[in-house]
């Protein structure tokens, strides 16, 4: 029987690449995204609950949850809109993952081999300038992942965290190519930005039934950037 997955943020970037790879392996995938065919606001608990119920009725119980939705934000602490940016960033990047896990939890436990993969960032492992809302949200997602691993591991559910580094997605496409190349030469040992499908490869590997002993792991997919240090 085919497994069923939900991928948040699955309409573009890393999320889209994850959807395509899961589907190529025969997994039935529902995309939760504000820009998807059926828009879902993952930062709203009621919207999440309704969408999960609809998915369950259409595809079956949920076996895999990939929380890939996220927004990149920043600004000075004393900025005029800092509080609003903070609240929105944590709502999308952290609280939404909690809503998703709660809505899917019964299915994941009942499956006996449920898989949760949270997509954070290398910002979860360090901090950059003027990115505190984003950095805090990703540190929080990493901590949430570890808590899930401890709380759910005994019920057959694994939770792991993938931390992409500089990747060619909508969050980085506005950066001039020359600036990207300069950054890559200086900070990334492999000398380039990553591709969404390279991150998706690791995400999907963690959803495999054979990955049942990988739990609470935090995996950087960053071309060696964190190993080198900034």
Protein language model regions, located:
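The beta1-alpha1 cofactor-binding region of Rossmann-like NAD(H)/NADP(H)-dependent oxidoreductases
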Residues: 40-50, 83, 197-198
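Residue(s) in the substrate-gating loop at a strand-loop-helix junction
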Residues: 121
